[in-house]
Every structure is written in C-alpha cells, then in structure tokens.
C-alpha cells in the first residue's frame, strides 16, 4: 500500500472515532463499512480523549487542524532544519484555519543520555542501526520471513553515511545530560507544546530503562510548569 492509499484510509477512519464515542454509529465508506456500533466503555472525557495525528506534509497538517485535532511531527533521521520546517508547516496551517483554536504540536525524535563519550557513541550506534533497518523496511526490497527482515550486513550499515552514528549524534537528541536539556529547550523555543521520545532502537531493554529513568529524574524537572 503506497502512502497516498494509506492516507486516504486514515482520513476516512479517524473521524469515525469521535462518532463511535458518541455511540450508535454506522459507517458505509469507500474503505470501511460497519453496522451501528458504540465504543464501550465510553471515554471519561465529555468529547472523548484528545486525538493526535502524525503529520509531515501540509495535507496531513490540514486534515488534523481542520478537525481541531493535535499534530505530532517527527524529523525522522534529520535534524534541526527539518524540525524547524515541520513547525513552520504547523504554524502556517494554523494561520490558514484560525477558527480551529484547540491545536497542540508535539515533536518526536530519538533521545539518549550518556555519561561519557563511550556511552554516547553506544546510543548513537544503536539509533544508527535502527534507522538502517527502518530505511530497509521502507525500500521494500529485502526478503521478509516470519515478520522479520532479512538482516543487514555490517558492511551495508557502515556504507550508509546518512544513518551513521556521527549523523545520529548530530541530528538526534543524543548527548550529555546538558546537551539533551539544551535540545529540548530548543524545541520548546520553536513553539512545540509537547516533546515525545522515540525510544525504539537497538539498545537493550535495561539500557532503555536506565535512560528513561535519567530523563524523568534529571530532564523533566527542568520543564515542569
């Protein structure tokens, strides 16, 4: 399924959520059909929980903003220039549709805190491996068996400069505690309302837990309202 087809399906199914929360809603669309249905249990919130739409292109932003939903963006493997570009798309979309006032923006990227260069390199390498595999999935050119991608060789990973550990260190929120704090502050200064950590990587579960504990203990208090 290409991105356009996937996007059309998303545009049809997401609006049904709010109607299912209201209850007794039937749907006869192009892609989805179901009889009168109700979401049980119903949400505690009056109009249901907030809906966040992952968006990168202007059309997806407009879909979210015109429905008064929030927007989550990610620069993927890219850095601050891409983050700024995405925030500008969000801001321009909000200006285009000023009547829709209840919009928040969230920025998602990979993050890792190291106590020294060895630990930082470890985090950057793990994220590098993640994006090499991420990119291979989207190329759709490797064999998949039992839901697992045919493994990349180390040579293939080493030859992909775009996803190198050096690029990950530069473009992702990976570094010392102070560097990570400074980066989150930079995202805040751009106008993002929320920051989200993309924790999926090739780090072990214990390394992820240790990092998350550091972030909760040492970074989040710097941004408490």
Locations of regions flagged by a protein language model:
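An alpha-helical appendage that flanks or caps ligand/catalytic pockets
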Residues: 4-39, 81-192
């Amino acid at each position: 399924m290409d991105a356009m087809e996937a996007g059309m399906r998303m545009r049809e199914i997401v609006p049904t959520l709010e109607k299912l929360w209201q209850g007794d809603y039937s749907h006869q669309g192009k892609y989805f059909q179901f009889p009168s249905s109700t979401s049980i249990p119903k949400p505690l919130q009056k109009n249901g929980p907030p809906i966040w739409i992952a968006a990168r292109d202007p059309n997806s932003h407009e879909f979210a903003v015109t429905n008064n939903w929030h927007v989550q963006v990610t620069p993927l493997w890219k850095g601050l220039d891409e983050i700024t570009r995405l925030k500008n798309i969000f801001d321009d979309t909000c200006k285009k549709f000023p009547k829709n006032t209840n919009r928040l923006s969230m920025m998602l990227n990979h993050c890792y805190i190291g106590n020294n260069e060895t630990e930082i390199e470890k985090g950057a390498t793990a994220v590098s491996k993640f994006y090499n595999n991420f990119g291979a999935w989207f190329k759709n050119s490797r064999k998949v068996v039992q839901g697992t991608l045919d493994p990349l060789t180390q040579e293939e990973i080493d030859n992909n400069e775009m996803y190198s550990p050096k690029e990950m260190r530069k473009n992702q929120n990976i570094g010392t505690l102070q560097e990570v704090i400074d980066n989150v502050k930079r995202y805040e200064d751009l106008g993002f309302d929320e920051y989200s950590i993309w924790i999926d990587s090739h780090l072990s579960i214990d390394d992820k837990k240790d990092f998350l504990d550091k972030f909760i203990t040492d970074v989040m208090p710097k941004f408490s309202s």
